[in-house]
Curated annotation (Swiss-Prot):
CDD domains for the chain: SerRS_core
Originating gene: serS
Pfam families noted in UniProt: Seryl_tRNA_N, tRNA-synt_2b
Name by which UniProt lists this protein: Serine--tRNA ligase
Organism listed in the record: Streptococcus pneumoniae (strain ATCC 700669 / Spain 23F-1)
Binding partners and assembly: Homodimer. The tRNA molecule binds across the dimer.
Length: 424
């Protein structure tokens, strides 16, 4: 959530920045007018309350003097009625301002490339060289079916489209991947957490999914509960409405969880395979940091995600998202895109974002600065470390052999009971 004071005092700059995210200046102008009206009403209310207090004191004095107070009582009643009417108007204005501030996206950092969409993203670096096959590489969904480790047909029968069963060494591979990821993040100082997989609406508001993106979630009917779209939601809300000690920052959390997404806007996209599912496992990283340290922490978090891909020897590239492609809550985002041979393309496997104080303001997560003792909003960061199903897809395609088998990456073999190959 944006700071109304920042919008008020730096209006032109904020308007210019949000325009790069598709926010019409008319929206901010309307917000500015409503805010000005609110402040004018507040002045009137304070003036009327002061007058009412004066009249109240005069009534008390008149009663002590045994004087008639009818006129003064009538005047005080009129003042109270005016205050009540203005308070009601203020409540309506506050509701409108809240609607504005909770639906506006975060202000992009100065270092974010300006652009309309993903075509304006900027490649930062690449790692590894895509393998040159001397045979036609299969898509991971065909490999999975041929190996008997991925079953979309029965997933569709039991549930519906974009669901599947992992079987045998496929299930073992999925488990090996997320255990490996959690172990690697643990070495980097992350505390492993098992979170609730169901959260309340306040938590969804805190991280920015609600109210704007309700259609993308699975709500439990007639309850205040939602299936988590990512472990970011419970992790980032862990300290909601709390004040932390500044000396304890930064704090690192990691968790593996299922993620549930309706993919409301993705009809017709990635209808086959593991790239876009309604339910998938993901290892998440979340950080709580001081404002002056958060961008250094973003670079570290991105490196932590890269470490997984490097140890799995999967070629990838790092991309800085443009203002038009970033997520709602992000001030800056790096995407990691892994090479998918059958698509001859890089596909997203991780997003690492600094939300600055956007989520912290919504969730009221603060810290007491040990230097001056003041309570301040901290910065939150989140990143995929990594999407597990997409990692399975990348391994199947990059490690496939001409006979249809798939070599298991060396880093995962200790988690696979020493198995080296998945054979048909």
């Amino acid at each position: 959530m944006l700071d109304i004071k920042r919008i008020r005092t730096d209006f032109e700059a904020v308007t210019e920045k949000l325009a790069t995210r598709g926010v019409d200046a008319a929206v901010l102008n309307e917000m500015k007018e409503i805010d000005a009206k609110r402040r004018n009403i507040l002045v009137k209310v304070e003036t009327l309350k002061a007058e009412r207090n004066t009249v109240s004191a005069e009534i008390a004095q008149a009663k002590r003097n045994k004087e008639n107070t009818d006129d003064k009582i009538a005047a005080m009643q009129n003042l109270s009625a005016e205050v009540k009417a203005l308070d009601a108007e203020l409540a309506e204005i506050d509701a409108k301002l809240t609607e504005f501030t909770t639906t506006l996206p975060n202000i992009p950092a100065d270092s974010v490339p300006v652009g309309a969409d993903e075509d304006d993203n900027v490649e930062v670096r690449r790692w590894g060289t895509p393998r040159e096959f001397d045979f036609e590489p299969k898509a991971h969904w065909d490999l999975g079916e041929d190996l008997g480790i991925l079953d979309w047909e029965r997933g569709g029968k039991v549930t519906g489209a974009r669901f599947l069963f992992y079987k045998g060494l496929g299930a073992r591979l999925e488990r090996a991947i997320y255990n490996f990821m959690l172990d690697e993040h643990g070495k980097e100082g992350y505390t492993e957490v098992i979170t609730p997989y169901i959260v309340n609406h306040d938590s969804m508001f805190g991280t920015g999914q609600y109210p704007k993106f309700k259609e993308d979630t699975f709500e439990l009917s007639d309850t205040n509960f939602v299936l988590i779209p990512t472990a970011e939601v419970p992790l980032a809300n862990y300290y909601r409405d709390e004040i932390l000690d500044g000396k304890d920052l930064p704090i690192y959390f990691t968790a593996m969880s299922p993620s549930f997404r309706s993919e409301a806007g993705s009809a017709g996209r990635d209808t086959r395979g593991l790239i876009r599912l309604h339910q998938f496992h993901k290892v998440e990283m979340v950080k709580f940091a001081k404002p002056e340290e958060s961008y250094e922490e973003l670079e570290k978090m991105t490196a932590n995600a890269e470490n997984i891909l490097q140890k799995l020897n999967l070629p990838y590239r790092v991309v800085a998202l443009s203002t038009g492609d970033m997520g709602f809550s992000a001030a800056k985002t790096y995407d990691l895109e892994v090479w998918i041979p059958a698509q001859n393309n890089y596909r997203e496997i991780s997003s690492c974002s600094n939300t600055e104080d956007f989520q912290a303001r919504r969730a009221q997560i603060r810290y007491r600065d040990e230097a001056d003792g003041k309570v301040k909003l901290l910065h939150t960061l989140n990143g995929s470390g990594l999407a597990v199903g997409r990692t399975v897809a990348a391994i199947l395609e990059n490690y496939q052999n001409e006979d249809g088998s798939v070599t298991i990456p060396e880093a995962l073999r200790p988690y696979m009971g020493g198995a080296e190959v998945i054979k048909p």
